[in-house]
Amino acid sequence: MAGMSQRPPSMYWCVGPEESAVCPERAMETLNGAGDTGGKPSTRGGDPAARSRRTEGIRAAYRRGDRGGARDLLEEACDQCASQLEKGQLLSIPAAYGDLEMVRYLLSKRLVELPTEPTDDNPAVVAAYFGHTAVVQELLESLPGPCSPQRLLNWMLALACQRGHLGVVKLLVLTHGADPESYAVRKNEFPVIVRLPLYAAIKSGNEDIAIFLLRHGAYFCSYILLDSPDPSKHLLRKYFIEASPLPSSYPGKTALRVKWSHLRLPWVDLDWLIDISCQITELDLSANCLATLPSVIPWGLINLRKLNLSDNHLGELPGVQSSDEIICSRLLEIDISSNKLSHLPPGFLHLSKLQKLTASKNCLEKLFEEENATNWIGLRKLQELDISDNKLTELPALFLHSFKSLNSLNVSRNNLKVFPDPWACPLKCCKASRNALECLPDKMAVFWKNHLKDVDFSENALKEVPLGLFQLDALMFLRLQGNQLAALPPQEKWTCRQLKTLDLSRNQLGKNEDGLKTKRIAFFTTRGRQRSGTEAASVLEFPAFLSESLEVLCLNDNHLDTVPPSVCLLKSLSELYLGNNPGLRELPPELGQLGNLWQLDTEDLTISNVPAEIQKEGPKAMLSYLRAQLRKAEKCKLMKMIIVGPPRQGKSTLLEILQTGRAPQVVHGEATIRTTKWELQRPAGSRAKVESVEFNVWDIGGPASMATVNQCFFTDKALYVVVWNLALGEEAVANLQFWLLNIEAKAPNAVVLVVGTHLDLIEAKFRVERIATLRAYVLALCRSPSGSRATGFPDITFKHLHEISCKSLEGQEGLRQLIFHVTCSMKDVGSTIGCQRLAGRLIPRSYLSLQEAVLAEQQRRSRDDDVQYLTDRQLEQLVEQTPDNDIKDYEDLQSAISFLIETGTLLHFPDTSHGLRNLYFLDPIWLSECLQRIFNIKGSRSVAKNGVIRAEDLRMLLVGTGFTQQTEEQYFQFLAKFEIALPVANDSYLLPHLLPSKPGLDTHGMRHPTANTIQRVFKMSFVPVGFWQRFIARMLISLAEMDLQLFENKKNTKSRNRKVTIYSFTGNQRNRCSTFRVKRNQTIYWQEGLLVTFDGGYLSVESSDVNWKKKKSGGMKIVCQSEVRDFSAMAFITDHVNSLIDQWFPALTATESDGTPLMEQYVPCPVCETAWAQHTDPSEKSEDVQYFDMEDCVLTAIERDFISCPRHPDLPVPLQELVPELFMTDFPARLFLENSKLEHSEDEGSVLGQGGSGTVIYRARYQGQPVAVKRFHIKKFKNFANVPADTMLRHLRATDAMKNFSEFRQEASMLHALQHPCIVALIGISIHPLCFALELAPLSSLNTVLSENARDSSFIPLGHMLTQKIAYQIASGLAYLHKKNIIFCDLKSDNILVWSLDVKEHINIKLSDYGISRQSFHEGALGVEGTPGYQAPEIRPRIVYDEKVDMFSYGMVLYELLSGQRPALGHHQLQIAKKLSKGIRPVLGQPEEVQFRRLQALMMECWDTKPEKRPLALSVVSQMKDPTFATFMYELCCGKQTAFFSSQGQEYTVVFWDGKEESRNYTVVNTEKGLMEVQRMCCPGMKVSCQLQVQRSLWTATEDQKIYIYTLKGMCPLNTPQQALDTPAVVTCFLAVPVIKKNSYLVLAGLADGLVAVFPVVRGTPKDSCSYLCSHTANRSKFSIADEDARQNPYPVKAMEVVNSGSEVWYSNGPGLLVIDCASLEICRRLEPYMAPSMVTSVVCSSEGRGEEVVWCLDDKANSLVMYHSTTYQLCARYFCGVPSPLRDMFPVRPLDTEPPAASHTANPKVPEGDSIADVSIMYSEELGTQILIHQESLTDYCSMSSYSSSPPRQAARSPSSLPSSPASSSSVPFSTDCEDSDMLHTPGAASDRSEHDLTPMDGETFSQHLQAVKILAVRDLIWVPRRGGDVIVIGLEKDSGAQRGRVIAVLKARELTPHGVLVDAAVVAKDTVVCTFENENTEWCLAVWRGWGAREFDIFYQSYEELGRLEACTRKRR
């Protein structure tokens, strides 16, 4: 402060209000009087008084507003100033008055320099003081470059903050880097708090500046909080708290998120938040300087969800005296990391909902203080715990074991010596690196087997690891580096099949026992290495299953001396680290097998068996070398040469000359193809490394008609020799075009030599010149004018041209040299051994052996006259039989096949997704002969009429070829692939070769040019091979469909007099859909053209050889004539042309290297054209007719509807007629939107999402209804109007516009054609603006909905019912599309829009976005790629695929529905595609975790790599109509057990007991989690007969007539029983009956001798007294049943049930039921549902529709279900359960008597109460099987159950009344007219049922046993009856016209359970889950878990697809 005392603070720092409004005058006075400036008086400028007068004059001028005068005075003053100091003082005057111009003048012209000391009169300081931002900017920019005057900047900043100049503050901080946290100080001064920018801003009340500073690096300090408490609080409350509405339980309140982080707050004042404490949901106080907190944080914040206290100085949190003070029970996340806590606050243990706790980087020595933690519940919901970077030495099990939901634990960087014992929780991630762990617990696999994925125990002191670590089934990442491991557990016991990364680096692997390195170590052996002595070899081996999953393996820094052999089998490895193993000197050749390995670390290794130069090239080269060694690769010099060219050009002669060196004597016949071998020796003087090259020569000839067939012999990596006749000159050059285009189309990038023959026919004297000319012509064909390669043609340069004379043999030697030289330079791209030259390439020995085997097979078949093709299975067998075969995987087999194709050994066409790809042709000659049959057909009417042949006639041509019915599909695919026969309908094919080259009659006579004609010309640089054939086939399909539409409309429409009606044609790949439809008069088509005439016009398409711009070209011309000027036919044709090019010939959409498009469209002006038609001289046409470029039309169409022609500007041409496809004139008028009724804005708030290709989807309203508008934006370029006509920019914009119009048209057409409830409907279209309106999805996309719902649950985030419905609706939409031959191609959750999440709604989703959908046109689809991860593996460039690609994507969408996650397999498209093709799929979880067994199985079926194995959408739809699909959750195998018991109440656990005495054990299964929580826990004792859990007690009865009572506490095992009771007989069943008194109940134990023991229990403890009820005594004394009556036999009590609201207990007594009155504990009534020898086995009480109780019972002999009304004891219904197909059975329910009968004390055995089941007869005969005859009023009176005769009687017995009264009545089952079909539909796969019963040889008795009901379960308001065969009958009670009836509403049967034996028991757990247990002959048990659906759920399920069916039908009718 010393510096301050010498001079008073400047006026700037007077922060009080009275001095703050300082004017420039006062400021200037102060500036002048502020003391000596330190400058000497100027010698020239006069005295200081004069200077003062000058400055005063300047100021006065500024004050008057006379800036001009002030500037003159300033300039004058400058002239008189000598020093910079004086000039600086002058500069401060205009700076003070904000005169920017004068400031610039002084700085630039007068070179005034700005001083950098922050004095009061510094111009920058003055400008900052007065807030002149522009002046400040100018002044600071005048400073020299490197200068950074920080003191000046800080002074100006503090000043501007105090004065309130936000603009200056922003400029200083953001542009010039002033530090908001620095004090403003001058030289030799100390900082003062008032000069801190934030302090100054707050003190002077400049709130906006204070906030700006706080957001840009300023912080609160204690002075600010003390001196300005209220402003500070105001700032914190106003700017650092965000609001959002609170949940509905707090109406009107807003939730507050307090974000006070990174403010360096020294404390938090209670006053800041006490009044809002109940609204705070998020409190972030991280990165402050807090050492204490107010007591309200966090314990008193009742709504707090998230708390972040990280990065402070907290030693503890506020204490609490009792748990009552902790009211923040809703807390979900706490972050308290980077503090100074020594233990976690005990209050945390009361936060029962806490999910995430981060406490890393503290000083924790204990987790919690045990002595302070009292009556805590524990963090049962905690999912993530991070306590890394602390000082913990142990983790107490006491606390950890309460973390029941923990899935992530991080205890890295502590001092743990022991890892805690595992406990029951779903732990997924465990990190414990950098501790002092010496051992690990061995029970990890018990609790975490199916959960733990990521484990890190690196950098510890582990000497061994337990086997359990490698038995974690879900384990993906295991890091054990930096330990002391010398061995791993034996690999044969590992089960970690999903392990991806294993890091074992920096261990002791390979060291022997003494710890010394030895030459031969005990740790590893390699194959073939023998060991001496008896030493047991301990080998590091990895299990075989890791080859599918392990990707990264680190073995570096160990003591290995060999690479473990099993490492070489890990074929998925991508990274392998072997460095720093000093003993490792060799790499095994087997490493070469690892095809995916890209990182091989051999750092510091001396590898002796790989040459050094190869090691330098890196891992790829090393692996290639090892692979070649391993596979005994040999150099191969065999290649394929294909000689082609027009007929009779001298091909065969040329070949003979090359082979023999002389001209042939015999002329060869016209064979289509000849094959021969030729070896070419190295010419003298060649430097090539190979001695010779061997060719498999295919000489392809034959008549010109066979030219299309010959393309099928063109393959990659072959040398093509195109032969032509020089003597024919230019004509022959033109003919070369066909061959060159063909070669490039079928074998892109092939090497082609063009050889001219007949050289001797050119005169010698003109020869050189003539040859040069002809060569130029050939090159002009293949190269563009700029010299670059022409698109569509092979890469031919002058080096590839040669001439030869076959007579004089001139040029033959040169040709040999050329062939040898070219061959030696050909590369083998994509080889398994690495890129190498083709000649002399290394080929695995096994490939060569396979080649020999294939050739031998081909010769054998030739001898036997057998078919010359192999199926894929036959080829695989051939591979397997080849000696020393090492071809193991699919990719290697493909490489071998490629080699066979490249060498001419095989022909194979892998570019279809299935079918043709499964055939391998051995002999091209044979194949050619087969195809020749087709070409031998003449266009006779008998077989092929108009070039179209019926499929059966085409099949007839197969007879005798060897193609069978099984391979006919492949044959047809082959014909279509090479355009030999193209499908034009389901049963007919077009044979293009039969079409005439010109129309058969004069078409010009039919065409009269009139004013009603428009034309379109397509100019193409080349016409691709197959273009016309495919175009005509598509046209024929479309025209046929058009006729069909007309025919249907005639039938359907009553009166429609329009000539052009709506025609929905979804054409081609791009699914364009023109509405053009006419009635054809004549259709004429030929090889390159088609003409259709109709009333009032015609349309024609033909090839045109137009020669515009004197450039080679072909193309097509379209003419459309219409008297009514409806030119929609033009749109119809152009749609087809564009789509065909898009899908099959995309090369045409490219440009030449000089930028000219390969294809251009022109539109001749119709006005000029009509005028020209009047002329007679055709030569004038080109000059007189204007050709509009399509680009001009498109660009004009964006702005207006007319285009002007330069030849008649006064007569504009309407674009709607010229380019009808752009204006959608072929669409019905009703589809065009009225723009006046469309309300939409394109601001950001209205954007719903981005479509493909830059389209944007907006929220809008049309006619008052919300809609989604998809807008196609055409790019705008700056100054586009000024762009010259012919520029690249114009072309780019036109291309973009064309693309937009094209995609708009395609998608709108597609949507218009589709009408289905699960597909988004088109509302209308608009051209200006270019958009269409769709239905608006209220809830956005499925992806968004899933991501919002997936946070809370691990699987099925939308719940099972909604998930089922959504999956069903997607499948239904797909089935509809596939029925329409449309392949969606881009199905994913983003393209599925959600309408409703209410399961009761009929429609929940709709499919959208058909941007890349394709129509398959009977030929499959080609091209388009969907979204990586969803896209099927077979979609690759140039591969033809079918609708099964959508089923693959559907599988991925199912994955999303089940997991809530996207199917992520990587970030790069190539990486994802590779993984998918290898069969790698996203990991979901075990079925018992996911709990939607059928949907998961369907998902896996859909994403099968082979398309033919995927289901059809239609079959998926029918599968999902079975309720089993939705209700079956999972099965769980439980091993050998002896008894099963379930829990009562809300618990999800079931218990198995096994063994007896010392080996007795129990297993606890949690059915909710699908998890065995306790596995075979030992609990010695006698065999358990019965068990009951009541509250916290478990009662178990054993076979030694004892009851043991155990107390249940947490996870504690059952050790010693709390109490033991004796009983007179073995207990067979228990029942707990609550009593009115609190905490007391009765336990009834039914005994084997018929007694019932009653134990009163108070507070969990049974009283000493126990009473017995004797059934025998009651029967005799009360019900007068004699002792000799069969009903008095000692029957065990099998079932007991509490009835009549707990006032009675009904229990079984043989065939009868006895009723106990709970009040008096006496038997008061007997009921007789059955007759002896039947025994009641199950009793259950449920409520019926009116809410009254009914009791159901079941017996073991008659197998019938009896229903009693509980209050009247009246028998109401009986149903026989032994019906094989009970679905939709009904039985009457007797109405109640008005008065209940008096209590019956007698029981007559002859006439039991109610309807007796006395008349049941069971008969068995050979013919009829088992028959059960029941004489009662049931609709299931007669059932024959023989293996095959069950159905007919069943159907006969069914009367119409057995069907539901209405299709959608409550809990009804939909039905079809055909009962049998309908049964098939609802019985879980009727076919599978049939197979289970009918196809197994089963005697009648076994069959009837399978139909025996096992138990009755009351599930919600339904009765479920499981039967021994494994199916479950579901029965509901329903009203029907006043009366009640029972009906079987479903039969559930899971075929998956068949192998598990018979159903033995069942139970309902937690009221909503049904568990059935199955036992097989080995006493192995399996649990089947079902969703316990009630009537409501079944109702929703059935209605969902009934309603969808109804809506589909309505849509069809509407159309």
From Swiss-Prot:
Keyword annotations from UniProtKB, A to Z: ANK repeat, ATP-binding, Cell membrane, Cytoplasm, Disease variant, GTP-binding, Kinase, Leucine-rich repeat, Magnesium, Manganese, Membrane, Metal-binding, Nucleotide-binding, Phosphoprotein, Repeat, Serine/threonine-protein kinase, Transferase, WD repeat
Compositionally biased region (Low complexity): 1841-1872
Occurrences of domain Roc (ranges): 632-826
Consequence of substituting T1075E: Phosphomimetic mutant which abolishes phosphorylation of RAB7A and blocks activation by phorbol ester. Increases phosphorylation of RAB7A by 2-6 fold
Membrane topology, as annotated: Peripheral membrane protein
Renumbered ranges of WD repeats: 1539-1579, 1582-1622, 1623-1668, 1693-1729, 1730-1778, 1779-1949, 1951-1987
Residues annotated as domain COR: 844-1036
GO molecular function: ATP binding; GTP binding; identical protein binding; metal ion binding; protein serine kinase activity; protein serine/threonine kinase activity
Residues that hold GDP according to the record: P647, R648, G650, K651, S652, T653, G669, E670, H758, D760, C806, K807
Residues at which ATP binds: L1248, G1249, Q1250, G1251, G1252, S1253, G1254, T1255, V1256, K1270
Main enzyme class: transferase
Cofactor names: Mg(2+); Mn(2+)
Resulting phenotype, T1061A: Slightly increases phosphorylation of RAB7A
GO biological process: bone resorption; intracellular signal transduction; osteoclast development; positive regulation of canonical Wnt signaling pathway; positive regulation of intracellular signal transduction
LRR repeats: from-to residues: 279-300, 303-324, 330-351, 353-374, 381-402, 405-426, 427-447, 451-472, 474-495, 498-519, 549-570, 572-594, 596-617
Phenotype upon changing M1298K: Enhances phosphorylation of RAB7A
InterPro entries according to UniProt: Ankyrin_rpt (IPR002110), Ankyrin_rpt-contain_sf (IPR036770), COR-A (IPR032171), Kinase-like_dom_sf (IPR011009), Leu-rich_rpt (IPR001611), Leu-rich_rpt_typical-subtyp (IPR003591), LRR_dom_sf (IPR032675), P-loop_NTPase (IPR027417)
PANTHER family: LRR RECEPTOR-LIKE SERINE/THREONINE-PROTEIN KINASE-RELATED, RECEPTOR PROTEIN-TYROSINE KINASE CEPR1
UniProt name for this protein: Leucine-rich repeat serine/threonine-protein kinase 1
Organism expressing this protein natively: Homo sapiens (Human)
